[in-house]
């Protein structure tokens, strides 16, 4: 019973306590409501005291500025501010204010906060900074409830909040961090993030103009402000209308800078924002212009799943542009994506969302979030599936370019992607099926390239392969692949096992298929009329080669063994000649020929790329065509190769077809397959019938003698096929085909696509009469204007590469010179350190003994005592003498240099020897005497001066020569013996090094006489006195201008001049730079040097900029004002950079406040200039 009574009493006490708390809270809320309902004009601000330890709801709490002052550890604030503080503490964890028992009071408090505080200009202008911050904190807490977000909009609070955020942001970005500025911005960005989280409310934010301020805050230096801005913009970018408005602003370059330089969390949020914005075409274009591809690809090495997922989806969107797709391949993006798909990396992730991160940021907890410690393996796996699906989507877009598709195949991409289609029952069904769909789509796009189709015929069973084919070429709709996935997942275990074995069979990294001679067969590249081509590697080497296998039983080589042997000998002989003679950039290199098992093997250069014939098929399936520029680029290279063969080597190819012309990177042409080529004597004809009939000339079909013009006919056929994507002569009936070729009957090229020059060149090349048909030189003369343009481009490219090479050479030379100079300096410093060690040893030996000497040297020179004992022995006297003699020589040289500089600067006169007064002599000599003498009590400080402090290099206190110049010789002579005595008795405790002491002792009278003779007649004419221009000040002024510009508030729209200056400043303070380089660069800038600035930091948009010499833009739409003819490769000169800097300074009003230029303003001062 007593226990039960005790429990009842405890329950009653807790109930009473709860009621007491509720009553107190109700009372506090009513008091706060009453305080807030007081109009600002009638508001009283009584001061009460409360403990400063409770005054922190934000991440940092600086000293209060205008609301009071600090005294004896307490803040003096208004009653309202204290009540707001208590409210924020009591309800910091509340989320549903509209369902709270005191919901009516909360709504009234919120309404009063908005009407009487937030939108009251009078109150805002007179309220202390901490007071307004607490209003914002209370608004932020209440706006967690969606009901209060609508109330804020209905009261007009969003527009006022946006205006206030703009004012605070401009002060923060323009003049640095003031009191509570960061906390205000963090709370306001949170409020706008909450508003933007609801789809229908995003328009409220953009209408108020808050998105512009949020974009400006991407340049914030405080992490919490930056994160708040990113979170709010990411929520806004979920809607298309908001994305369009955001993408109109200057945002992409800032985002790329954050991705390149900031911390992981900032990168992750920035990547997500950029992923959303890349739905807009102008954003994708800016990513390309601002060289964003290398930045994005560098992040593929990260191990954070959500960051990688966002980056890959950005690549999916930007690689829709053909140029960007090529750039991704050049930067190694295809290899990185395939590496992610291989699944041999350990990834991390987290549970956080935009909303949770925003709340953590506002509460100051965002840095406490941890990564994937709490994520289960299943969650990691699901996120990995999403990332792999994104990589498949990126590869799908990339393989639309035939060269990219070829690289995917070469990098074992078909095998890597095909492994992802296999079902796994342990996987999440929905995620797994989606990944299978993306993988099938990537494989189907690769299958659309004709040369890859044999690979896929080995992968799937017949029924599955039919569904795979029926989907069609280049179908992006992911739902079209769901039937294929369902069919695959319903297969029995044995069929799935067979598909898995088929996938393993196409793995290029498996052991070689077989060996032929010393060559390992790695892959089958293709087949031709006379055999197959393989990718091989020499048994003891690493280089990849191509090897053609020719079947000698082909009827073309003869009907019996004797004819075949004769043909083989001729072919080997011709190939040997070709191997030894042909050196041309557009002709394949041959390395070796050999016979084995009735087969001829030809080892040649491996050409990375695809045959021209495959490009024809691919373009036809995509319903695209060659541009005329690309058509001429390929045709000109063919003409150059044939001219070399025909005119210099007298070789006829005889089998020039699209499959024997390889297109590499940037459409570089390589003519291959010289197995049928024939070297002929001058003016002779060939008679054997060889080659592919579709491209054979009429004289070959009529068995007439032919020459090099047979290749001209073939190149005409190829030009026709580039224009129409179909051969000029085609028929399933061989007789009909031969008739068309002999009569040169073909369909005309469609009009309106290409110029008349294309059709004229085709008709001349396809002249049936060999005598009337032009040779390759005459063909080239027909397109001389096109070739001149081609040559112009080549010359420009060559000049650009030469300049780039010269810049690299100079940079490398400068690097090695600096490295050598540093090495010499290091050796010199070590030598000086060693010399001073011996000097110190000689100074200390007579008083401190060997033990103290060993200790001092160990401390000052950082040498172990044992090492010193080993080096300091019987040769010490000789070493010291050498050191002293060297130092004497250096001192004499220094004196000579000093006097020569004095003679250069001053006029020497013999009539002013009596200009010194007696007091001057006396004071000067006293100073001189004090410099030479030292008491025992001064020894410690002098020793510290000598050693330079702990860890610093010893630096002797040298005698000031300007004092010696003013001392008359008779005064020196009068006291020289006194000085000598002091030198003899007190030199051990003096701070001067031994070299000066010995020099003064041995040559004191002569030195004094010499100094007096050099200085007795010095006089300076008043007319020749001029103000000295301080070079350091000029450098600092120029540096001040640059930093002033880079600290201006960010512009909402693109300002390319400021971008140029910003990049220049970054290059000045980069890790590769140093103080000497900084001084040199600023000096060149001040002098307006015509040299180009290195390194070239221009992005792809600068070549669009032009400016007339008078400063007016050539185009009314070009507001940049950058110097004329800025080319991407050339860069910009220091002179042009100086002009750009001055123009930006004029625009920003830098020179309008000359009177204030050298006045400093304390942070937080309100009366500083506002025009920037």
Swiss-Prot record:
Residues 855-875, 898-954 are annotated as: Disordered. ARM repeats lie at residues 209-251. Residues 919-945 have a biased composition (Polar residues). Expressed in the lung. It catalyses: L-seryl-[protein] + ATP = O-phospho-L-seryl-[protein] + ADP + H(+); L-threonyl-[protein] + ATP = O-phospho-L-threonyl-[protein] + ADP + H(+). Its cofactor is Mg(2+). Changing residue 748 to L: In CILD44; uncertain significance. It is linked to Ciliary dyskinesia, primary, 44: A form of primary ciliary dyskinesia, a disorder characterized by abnormalities of motile cilia. Respiratory infections leading to chronic inflammation and bronchiectasis are recurrent, due to defects in the respiratory cilia. CILD44 inheritance is autosomal recessive. This is Serine/threonine-protein kinase Nek10. It comes from Homo sapiens (Human). The lineage of its organism: Eukaryota, Metazoa, Chordata, Craniata, Vertebrata.
